[in-house]
Amino acid sequence: MAQFLSKPFGMTPNGEKINEYIISNPGGLAVSVLNYGCIIKNIWVPTKRGPVDVVLGHDTYADYVKDFESSGSTCCGAFVGRYANRIENAVFNVGGKTYQLEANNGKNHLHGTFPRKLYEVKTFGDTLLLEAESPDGEDGFPGNLKISVRYILTEDNALRTDYRVSSDADTIINLTNHTYFNLDGGGDVLGQKLRIYASRYLEGNNETCPTGNILPVAGTPMDFRAGKPIGRDIDTGFSQTTMVGGGYDHCFVIDRGRGASQSLCAWASSDKTGISMKVYTTQPGVQLYTGNFLQDCPAPGKGGVPMQKYGGFALETQHFPCSPSHPEFPSTALRAGKVFRANTTLRFFTGKQCGKL
């Protein structure tokens, strides 16, 4: 049975309380979540040498605000929406109507304001439930949304995230979590190994929007199918990696198992700590971001240490970016009265439990 601990983490200028909720299981895995942005602040994985915190974050609420309200927000650990990733030219059409959004990433719209929301929290059993609403017109999107995020910690060292969103008007939705992982517990992630179960990826343009071409990974630095160190092909002069700051910021099309409710999409491991992580999801894509601009974060990381380039990698399970501009992509439309559901599971292993990547 999971155990819960709640403690104060800060207060908004309006006097609203920011709390930290720590969930732990009998095996020693523990997760810290904030009611601000549904942020995953810490994941402590038990090892023979003691627990290792494998995610990036900040020590104070003020630092999260400083980060998230900057033009180069990292969205560190946050639940992202209304539309995770980009909407090209910050415009889309749904239900026969055209909507203009805030252009917050050049001329495009990126992620939205869910990371800066406060959520009501309930705890029961092994579950942390966070709920909020998004009013019609927020960021320019139509529809009043009811939002539900569940974090479920299991006894076999897995953290499952369930999303449930309903709308009273036709709209679009794309949700993810923007946690940065570092399975070494510090330093850069270039030597950590990663396998992505994807034979294809979305080609990007110089604004990190899909061109519409879905290309094979074979024979390119985008090929993670056999597993390799994250940094092995990161600096080869390949145009797709150079145009995003010398790294990866690309959506991979997951090779889905036939009839599977969740598919294994990624497997990462650290030789230093012996920690491995497998990622399963119901979503069609996973965005790999290797922290190419983390060094620009205006707020310090944990322990006051500045964020560094390649200091973490994100595996953002999601629908494809800019889907409203590409009718050939899986639809992100959410019709009035319908419910969007998706879930992702992170499963952690140590030593030889997981096999060798």
Residue map of PLM features:
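An exposed, glycine/acidic-rich loop-and-rim segment of catalytic or binding clefts
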Residues: 2-357
